[in-house]
Amino acid sequence: MPVAVMAQNPVSFQRLQEQCEEQELEAPGGIANPQVYSQLLALYLLHNDMNNARYLWKRIPPAIKSAHSELGGIWEVGQKIWQRDFPGIYTSISACQWSEAIQPVMEAVRDATRRRAFGLVSQAYTSISADDFAAFVGLSVEEAVKGVIEQGWQADLATRMVMPKKPDSAPLSLIPNEQQLARLTDYVAFLEN
């Protein structure tokens, strides 16, 4: 059974996940090879699909888990994501020597986690210390401050504080009254029939 091809962009990662899921389902005896499990687990983490990641971890036979330490490393990252331990996520990702098939996925997990952290900070904080922010996004203080400035945020080097820019709220799509009335009419007609 061939292992799924490498993926480099989000569409490819989604397709790779679908291929791995299919390979797991079609595996002889219901047990896929370890690389399929590794890729699928890492891809679930990338897409922040923690429920499927947990159930996959429970499905993987113990013999495969113990024989392939990389699976344990991926699951350790998953546990840190589950606990929302952002510094721990980055530490766990950099602590392992990933195989060639898993390396790009784990780098994407790190980048996606960093983007989520930036988004969370921008929504939750009016100011945060540069040290705390750097730990939260898994960068050195200098790199974090540089990233903040690139995002259009403010950084005060004297007080070592970062002031996030609030995200632009998505504009509400206003539906014209005629469309609302037509939609309501269709709904009522459906309920009557």
Curated annotation (Swiss-Prot):
<protein>
    <recommendedName>
        <fullName>COP9 signalosome complex subunit 8</fullName>
    </recommendedName>
</protein>
<keyword id="KW-0736">Signalosome</keyword>
<feature type="domain" description="PCI">
    <location>
        <begin position="8"/>
        <end position="181"/>
    </location>
</feature>
<comment type="similarity">
    <text>Belongs to the CSN8 family.</text>
</comment>
<comment type="subunit">
    <text>Component of the CSN complex, probably composed of cops1, cops2, cops3, cops4, cops5, cops6, cops7, cops8 and cops9.</text>
</comment>
<comment type="function">
    <text>Component of the COP9 signalosome complex (CSN), a complex involved in various cellular and developmental processes. The CSN complex is an essential regulator of the ubiquitin (Ubl) conjugation pathway by mediating the deneddylation of the cullin subunits of E3 ligase complexes, leading to modify the Ubl ligase activity.</text>
</comment>
<dbReference type="GO" id="GO:0008180">
    <property type="term" value="C:COP9 signalosome"/>
</dbReference>
<keyword id="KW-0963">Cytoplasm</keyword>
<dbReference type="GO" id="GO:0005737">
    <property type="term" value="C:cytoplasm"/>
</dbReference>
<dbReference type="GO" id="GO:0010387">
    <property type="term" value="P:COP9 signalosome assembly"/>
</dbReference>
<dbReference type="GO" id="GO:0000338">
    <property type="term" value="P:protein deneddylation"/>
</dbReference>
<dbReference type="InterPro" id="IPR000717">
    <property type="entry name" value="PCI_dom"/>
</dbReference>
<keyword id="KW-0539">Nucleus</keyword>
<dbReference type="InterPro" id="IPR033205">
    <property type="entry name" value="COP9_CSN8"/>
</dbReference>
<dbReference type="InterPro" id="IPR033464">
    <property type="entry name" value="CSN8_PSD8_EIF3K"/>
</dbReference>
<dbReference type="Pfam" id="PF10075">
    <property type="entry name" value="CSN8_PSD8_EIF3K"/>
</dbReference>
